[in-house]
Amino acid sequence: MSLFDWFADRRKGQYVGKVNQEPDEGDGLWSKCPECGQVVYRKDLLSNASVCGNCGYHHRIDSTERIAVLVDPNSFVPMDQELQPTDPLGFKDRRAYADRLRETQASTGLRDGVITGLCEVEGIPMALAVMDFRFMGGSMGSVVGEKITRLVEVATAKKLPLLIVCASGGARMQEGMLSLMQMAKISGALERHREAGVLYMPLLTHPTTGGVTASFAMLGDLILAEPKALIGFAGRRVIEQTLREKLPDNFQTAEYLQEHGFVDSIVPRTQLRSTLASLLRLHGCESRVASS
């Protein structure tokens, strides 16, 4: 729906002044693309998996939206929903970690920064973990690590292919060494999954950085990424200051990493489900309907 059509529907029979004026995004009906500046009717944007129809920019989406885009309707069965983070170090910077947790849980409706569960993609059973950047920047703490590890172990036991959707700033500093240990714990579980001969694919979305990049995000049999996703370990400014040289403009993008062999395929969000299904079938995974 175009801006003109929307005004026509809303104000039939009324004089409309300043028709070309951009609508207020604050009303929740419109979204402005940060890439091309196009103002899009929000319902149209959501119906296109939050991808700009004008320039292809991938807007950030939360874990619930991500699951809806990826899996068959009503097929997702969540796991370990009761797990909740604590504050073992009594950490406090400008604010107490416990207060940050409570506020973030209230604003997002999540207990921590990842949702895990079993699902189907075009009828093919799969294990799925989806990180949510809204929860403290998608940072990886003890609960995130535990939930992903448990999911990997279930996938290994049931011989299920596994997809982890990465969206994270890295390890959660408020949990110190406990958060860093999740890198090794998840990596160990993934190695056992690999030894069992089962497919694992990480999907790198914007942004995937820090300890997540340094562990399970780069351990896949096939590494997928969304277009123009920021992927890296340290930040661009830190690297430039360390090397004392200017980095390429597209440095740490999905396209740059694919060009240099770190990413196998860049898949537009609107094609993800069909692409996943094709890859799963290519690796011998069958749908429940076909197998029955």
UniProtKB/Swiss-Prot annotation:
Primary residence: cytoplasm
Cofactor(s) recorded in Swiss-Prot or TrEMBL: Zn(2+)
Residues in CoA carboxyltransferase N-terminal domain copies: 29-292
Presence of keyword ATP-binding: yes
Positions that bind Zn(2+): C33, C36, C52, C55
GO terms of biological process kind: fatty acid biosynthetic process; malonyl-CoA biosynthetic process
Source species, domain of life: Bacteria
Entry's cofactor comment: Binds 1 zinc ion per subunit.
The enzyme's E.C. designation: 2.1.3.15
UniProtKB keywords: ATP-binding, Cytoplasm, Fatty acid biosynthesis, Fatty acid metabolism, Lipid biosynthesis, Lipid metabolism, Metal-binding, Nucleotide-binding, Transferase, Zinc, Zinc-finger
SUPFAM superfamilies in the cross-refs: ClpP/crotonase
Pfam families, per the entry: Carboxyl_trans, Zn_ribbon_ACC
ZnF C4-type span: 33-55
Cellular component per GO, a single term: acetyl-CoA carboxylase complex
Catalytic activity reported: N(6)-carboxybiotinyl-L-lysyl-[protein] + acetyl-CoA = N(6)-biotinyl-L-lysyl-[protein] + malonyl-CoA
GO molecular function terms noted in the UniProt entry: acetyl-CoA carboxylase activity; ATP binding; carboxyl- or carbamoyltransferase activity; zinc ion binding
Keyword Membrane on entry: no
Top-level EC class: transferase
NCBIfam families on file: accD (TIGR00515)
Family designation: Belongs to the AccD/PCCB family.
Name of the protein in its database record: Acetyl-coenzyme A carboxylase carboxyl transferase subunit beta
Organism: Synechococcus sp. (strain CC9311)
